[in-house]
Amino acid sequence: MSAHDLKLEEIVNAETLRRKLNELADTADESYTSLPMRKVVLQTLKDALASGRANAEDMLMKDGGGTLCAKRLCYLMDTLIDILFEFATTRAYPTRNPSKAENMALVAVGGYGRGGLAQGSDIDLLFLLPYKQTPWGEQVVEYTLYMLWDMGLKVGHSTRNIDECIRLAREDMTIRTALLDARFLTGDKDLFRTLEIRFEEEIVKGTEPEFIQAKLAERDARHRKAGETRYLVEPNVKEGKGGQRDLHTLFWITKYFYRVKTKEELVKLGVLSRAELKLFNKAEDFLWAVRCHMHFATLKAEERLSFDIQPEIAQRLGYTAHPGQNYVERFMKHYFLVAKDVGDLTRIICAALEEQQAKHVPGFNRIFLTFSRRKRKLSDDGAFISENHRINIARPDIFRQDPVNMIRLFHLADRHGLEFHPEAMQSLTRSLKLINADLRENPEANRLFLEILTSPRNPELILRRMNESGVLGKFIPDFGKIVAMMQFNMYHHYTVDEHLLRCIAVLSEIEHGELKTEHPLSNHLITTIKRDRNLLYVTLLLHDIAKGRPEDHSIAGARIARRLCPRFGLTPSETETVEWLVREHLTMSMVAQSRDLNDRKTIIDFADTVQTMERLKLLLILTVCDIKAVGPGIWNGWKGQLLRTLFYETELVLTGGFSELSRAARDKQAREALAERLSDWPKEERDAYLALPYTNYFLTVSLDDQVRHAHFIRDADQQGRALVTMAKPHAFEAVTEITVLAPDHPRLLSVITGACAAAGGNIVDAQIFTTSDGRALDTILISREFDTDDDERRRAERVGKVIEDVLSGKAHLPDMLAKRTKPKKAARAFKVEPRVEINNTLSNKFTVIEVEGLDRPGLLSELTGLISDLSLDIASAHITTFGEKVIDSFYVTDLVGHKISNATRQGNIKRKLLALLGAENGARTNGRSPQAAA
C-alpha cells in the first residue's frame, strides 16, 4: 500500500502544523507552559484532529477502503503526537545539556502499535526510559498526556525503563502481546531498538508454545463471553468470533513463531498461499471499513453491530436490496461470510504451525493436545488415518483421486468419534473446487451424507464442521445460498444456516432423552416413530432452505425438498412426507399461538390439513425443534402447552374420539358435571350460579377451572365486592393466570390490558366471558418472570392490584402508560408493514380479526379499545410476539352475538385498525410476509 494510495497529505500536513505551532510559540509573550499558551496549542491540535478525522471519513465514503481509513487515522494520530512531543521537549520543557538519563522514546503499543485506528480507538502509549524517571521526564509525560486527554482522546499509558518492560513482559501475557506490537513514534530510536532486541532475545525465544497456548485460550474465553457462534445477528466486530481480534490473534501467533513483520512474509514461508493472503487482506479491509463506519456514525467507540445501526452502516457501504433480501440482510450476509473466512484462516494457520513446527519446538504438541504421534488406518484404501484421536489424510492427493473422500472424511470422523486434524481441514478447504455435479449426484456420496445427517451420535457437530469447511454449501448448493444469511428482525438470533444446525442439535437431544422434562410429549413421540426419524432430520435441514427468495419460503422449500430427497436416497413416499413437512412447517405453530384452541372448528380444520397421526407426530416434533432453535428465551412453557393442547385435541379427531354432540348437549353435560362438583352448595345457590355463565363458557373452560371460578365468584359475592382479581401461577407452562371479575362495560378488556401493560405484565392470551347478571369474568395469561411460585404469585397480585385501582378510578391509566419505557432502541430500526385480516371461515361462531404490526407498549390496550369502540364484543384474544413484530388474533361478534358479514362494516374496521397500527411505525421495512417470523 503506497503513500499515494493513502493520500496522507489530505489528512494532515505535518510541516504546516509544525510551522504554525512554532510561529505561535515564537510570537508568544507568555511562558510556553502558561495557561493561555496551552489553550492556543490545544485548540490548534484539536482543529487538526477534527479536520483530519472529517477528511478520513470523506475519503472512506468515496473509496470504501477500510484498511486505508485505519492507516490514515493512525497517521493523523502519529503526526499530532510527534508534533506535541516535540513541542513538549523543545518548547515547554527544553533541556540545555541533557544527560543520558533524560533520553526518552515514545512508543505506540497494542492496537495503536499495529498501525491501524478507528475514530474511537484507544491510544496506547509507552514512555520508554533508559533508567529511572527524572523530574524532567515526569514534566514531559504529564504535559503530553494532559494535552491528549484534553483533546478528547482515550489514552492508555505506561512509563517504564527497558528492564521493567522485560520483567513485566515475562510475567504478564497482556503486556507481552502489547510489546509484540510496539512501534516507534518519536524520541530516542536507539533506546527503542534496544528494547526490540532484548524482547526478542529474552522473551520470545523458546517461549513460542507458551505464547500460542495462552493466545488460543484467551481467544476461546473471549468467544464464550461475546457468544460462541460467529453467526449472532448483532455481532461484536472487534471481539466477536470471526471479528478483528481473531485476525489479530492469528498475526500475533505467526509473528511470534516465524519472527515476521508483515503478512506477506507468511507466503514466502509457505504458511499461506497467495489466495489465502488475499482472503486475509480482504477480511481485514472489510472489518476495518465496518468498524470505522460504526465509529463515525455513532460518534463513539461502538463495537457491537446492533440492529439500530445496521441500516446506516449498510447504506454507508453501498448495499442495495435484491429480490427476497433487503439491503441490511445483504450487508450482514457479507459480514458473516467474512467471519467464516476468518475461521478458515484460523484452521489454515494452525495446520501450518503444527505441521512445520511441531517437530522442531519442544512441547509444541501440547498446544494441540497431541501427546503422541501414533497413527492407525481408518479405511481399507489407507486414505485416512487416525492421528492422536484426530482424523487426517494419509496423502495430499486423496481428494483429487476420489472426490467422494471429501464426504467420507466426515463419515469416518462421525463413526469413530474423532476430531479433525487441521491439516485435513486445510486440504479440504483447498479442494472445494472438486465438488461438482458429478459428486453431488454420486450415490455413494449421498448415502454417506444421509448417514451423517441422521447419525445416532451427534450429527450437528459433524454437519457444523462440514459447513465451516465449505463442503456442505458446495455439496448442497441450495444450502450454500442460506449460509451466513441473516433476517433483519429482533426475533431470529442466528443466521439461517446456524438455525438449521441448531434445529438438528435439538432433535438429537430429544432423541437421546436429554430434554424429557422440558419436552415430555416430544420425548415420548420420538420413540414411536423410529421408522420415520430420518425424515425429521432431513426436514430440519431443509425447512428454511428457501429463505431469502421472493416467494414464500415454505412453498419454495417444499419444491427443493422434492428435488433433493431422491438424491439423498429417500423413497417416493418418504419424499412426499418431507415435502409436506417443509411446506407445513409453520402451520402448527401458527394455529397453536394464533387461534382459539377451544373452538372446535380450529381443531377440525387443522386435522384436515394433517390427515394422519404419523404426520401429526412428525409435525409436533419439527415445530418444537424449530421454535427452540430460534434463540435463547424464545421457547417457553406456554408455547409448549399450546402445542400439546393442539396435538391432543387433533389426536381425538384423527383417531375417532372426537365427540360430535351438539352444542346444547355438550352444554348440558358440562353444567351437570359442574353441579356434581358443587354438590356441597345449597341447591338454590347452586342452581342460581349455574344459570350465570353462558354456553361458550362451559364449552371452553376446564372443569377444574370452572370449580375455581365458582368459589371465586361466590367469595366475592359474600364479601360484597363487585371488583376483584385472583392470581394463579402455572410453573410448567411458564405463565401466570389473572382472573378479573368486574361489572361489564364495552372497554373493559382495553382497560384491563392497559393496566396490565402499565404494571409490566406481558399478556400472551385472554379469554373473555360475560354472565347473565351483567358481569365480566376475564382470564388473562401473562408471561412468568420469577422462578418460584410464591414470588410469581406476589408479582401477579401486584398486577391485579393495579388492574383493580384502574378499574375503580384510583389510578389514571394514561399517566401510568406514559411512564412505561419507550420501545427498545433496536426496535426503532424496524418497520413492520401493518396488516389486518377479517375472516369468517376460521370459526363457526366468531369472526376472527388478525392484526400484525410493530409492537409497542400499550398496543394491545389500544387495539382492544378500538375494537370495543367499533361495537364489537371480544370473546378471546391470542397474542404472539416475534421480536419487534406482534400478531394478535381476536375472536369477535357484534353486540347481538352475530358474525361481522357486512363488507362495508368490515372495510371500516380494517381501515381504522390499519390507521392505529401505522400510527407509530419504525423507520425501515424488513419486507417480510406474515409467516416469515417463524
Swiss-Prot record:
Record-annotated ACT domain positions: 737-818, 848-931
A Pfam short name: HD
Alphabetical UniProt keywords: Hydrolase, Magnesium, Multifunctional enzyme, Nucleotidyltransferase, Repeat, Transferase
Tree of life domain: Bacteria
GO molecular-function term, one example from the UniProt record: phosphoric diester hydrolase activity
Region of interest (Uridylyl-removing), ranges: 380-736
Regulation: Uridylyltransferase (UTase) activity is inhibited by glutamine, while glutamine activates uridylyl-removing (UR) activity.
Reported cofactor(s): Mg(2+)
Catalytic activity: [protein-PII]-L-tyrosine + UTP = [protein-PII]-uridylyl-L-tyrosine + diphosphate; [protein-PII]-uridylyl-L-tyrosine + H2O = [protein-PII]-L-tyrosine + UMP + H(+)
Region Uridylyltransferase: start-end pairs: 1-379
Ranges for domain HD: 496-613
One example of a Gene Ontology biological process annotation: regulation of nitrogen utilization
Gene3D superfamilies registered for this protein in UniProt: 3.30.70.260, Beta Polymerase, domain 2, cca-adding enzyme, domain 2
Signal sequence bounds: none
Listed EC numbers: 2.7.7.59, 3.1.4.-
Record remark on domains: Has four distinct domains: an N-terminal nucleotidyltransferase (NT) domain responsible for UTase activity, a central HD domain that encodes UR activity, and two C-terminal ACT domains that seem to have a role in glutamine sensing.
PANTHER family to which the protein is assigned, alphabetical: BIFUNCTIONAL URIDYLYLTRANSFERASE/URIDYLYL-REMOVING ENZYME (PTHR47320), BIFUNCTIONAL URIDYLYLTRANSFERASE_URIDYLYL-REMOVING ENZYME (PTHR47320:SF1)
Family membership: Belongs to the GlnD family.
Job of this protein: Modifies, by uridylylation and deuridylylation, the PII regulatory proteins (GlnB and homologs), in response to the nitrogen status of the cell that GlnD senses through the glutamine level. Under low glutamine levels, catalyzes the conversion of the PII proteins and UTP to PII-UMP and PPi, while under higher glutamine levels, GlnD hydrolyzes PII-UMP to PII and UMP (deuridylylation). Thus, controls uridylylation state and activity of the PII proteins, and plays an important role in the regulation of nitrogen assimilation and metabolism.
The protein, known as: Bifunctional uridylyltransferase/uridylyl-removing enzyme
Gene this protein is translated from: glnD
